[in-house]
Amino acid sequence: MLYKDLKDSIKSLGFLSIEDFVQYIGVTPSDILEWEEKDEVPYTVSLIIHLLKGDRDLPNNKSLDSLVEECLPLAELLEEASSFPYKLEEMFLLQKELNDSTNGKNWELGRNKFGKEINWLRCIHMEVAELIDSTPWKHWKNINSEPDMNNIHVELVDIWHFLMSYILQETNVPRAVSLVNTHCIYEASEDIDVKAMVKEAEKLSYIALAIETGNIPSFGGIERFIDQFFRCCKISGLSFTWLQKLYIGKNCLNKFRQDHGYKEGTYIKTWNGSEDNVIMVSVLENMENVSFDELYSKLEENYPSN
């Protein structure tokens, strides 16, 4: 939304000047200067105009109508975000259950049931490297190849798996949900800038290293970690909704494999010509809202009997 369009539109709302409008919505003069310099106005202002338009009987105005159309995706996102706290709680509880099962009780103290040290920060660092390796960053081979966006999204889910574990090591589930909730409201990019995506992913490693070396306090670094992670998701085109679906999917498929003989070697990984993870993603794509139990049941329906 352009600043000059805003000036035209607010007149249709009954405001005499831009100053009257910004005073009404409670922004500062420095905000206005920034909008004017960039000739761009934040999305939230478009949303306010949309709400005001609904309150008044207004004449037709092309600029105003275009602003309303622009802000509708945000309005839809905000409506969808009402379910995010529940989805976050489900993911954190599933992650805690998984960690309790694989690492034993009291894994939050930094050691698993075998006495092995747990280092979630190093896990994140390694997954970031795998994400970057899914892009054509190498100057010595495959220089013209395309980034594997599907695998990049999977790697982001793996990073999320370890980031949630790190957060749970430092705090409890309700506090974890509260910390994350405001960060996961964003619009995923449609045009992916691969170089920018790699740079944003590398910052996750920098934060992990800064915490590990004591340059950032452990708990204080969590907010920066969360913010940077969702920046990576946004620039990589991974919406929170799809992140949640993929996380539930991977968690559910791992449980399904264990329940059907994965450790014993009797598990069937290819289902009617397709690998189980491909089937899992196709099932997710047809589910508007995903829950662990519902997905598990659908995997049961698709699993070959022999």
Predicted regions and their residues:
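Flexible "arm" and connector segments at domain edges
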Residues: E76-N306
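Short acidic alpha-helix initiation/capping motifs at coil-to-helix transition points
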Residues: S12, V27, G221-F225
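DNA major-groove recognition helix of helix-turn-helix/homeodomain DNA-binding modules
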Residues: E40-N61
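Residue-level detector of alpha-helical secondary structure
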Residues: K7, E36, I49, K53, ...
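Short alpha-helical DNA-recognition segment
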Residues: F15-E34
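Secretory-pathway ectodomains
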Residues: Y3-I10, Y24-V27, L51-D55
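A short, Lys/Arg-rich alpha-helix, primarily the initiator
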Residues: M1-G14, L77-E80
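Short, charged recognition helix plus adjacent turn
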Residues: R56-E80
